[in-house]
């Protein structure tokens, strides 16, 4: 059963193939940590959202419960070994561990969302910070002068 108003797209998160103020919501799950220029991607998402439109990000994050750290580190070290055993290639699983470690912590990502122009920014930790859901809203303001770089030549 399809939904006429629901659209899934695949593209460069830093240069979205969408006009300004064209989305009611944007969701990215376990993908932001793979984006090279996260600030640019967040700005592009804000421009693509209609005023009041919501962004929701589900991503691995940083532990908030220090008691979980030894178990988490041990578990993280197993990913490449299990990946090697199952697929014969440890490198994607090593990348997973490294990309999680390099991803901004909860407060840094919250600040990045605010810098990108989102309002009502916050986050909820899941599983003691193993993952977090960040959210923000495109502000209600006149953005007629804002330009999505993907469509700059069309404006």
Residue ranges and their predicted role:
Residues 24-38:
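A short SAM/SAH-binding and catalytic strip from SAM-dependent methyltransferases
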Residues 58-116, 122:
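C-terminal alpha-helical "lid/dimerization" subdomain adjacent to the S-adenosyl-L-methionine
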Residues 14-25:
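A short acidic, Gly/Pro-enriched loop at the edge of an enzyme's catalytic core
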Residues 39-54:
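A short glycine-rich, Lys/Arg-flanked "PGG" loop and its adjoining helix->strand segment in the class I
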Residues 110, 116-155:
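Core SAM-dependent methyltransferase catalytic element
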Residues 2-14:
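Conserved SAM-binding strand-loop segment of SAM-dependent methyltransferases
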């Amino acid at each position: 059963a399809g939904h006429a108003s629901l659209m899934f797209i695949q593209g460069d998160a830093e240069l979205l193939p969408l006009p300004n103020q064209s989305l009611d919501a944007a969701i990215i799950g376990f993908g932001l940590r793979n984006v090279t220029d996260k600030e640019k991607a967040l700005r592009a998402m804000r421009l693509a959202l209609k005023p009041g439109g919501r962004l929701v990000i589900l991503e691995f994050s940083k532990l908030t419960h220090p008691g979980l750290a030894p178990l988490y580190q041990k578990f993280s070290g197993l990913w490449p070994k299990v990946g090697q055993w199952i697929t014969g290639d440890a490198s994607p699983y090593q990348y997973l561990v490294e990309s999680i470690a390099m991803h901004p912590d909860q407060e840094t990502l919250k600040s990045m969302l605010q810098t990108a122009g989102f309002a009502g920014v916050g986050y909820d930790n899941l599983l003691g910070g193993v993952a977090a859901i960040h959210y923000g809203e495109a502000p209600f303001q006149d953005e007629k002068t804002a330009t999505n770089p993907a469509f700059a030549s069309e404006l």
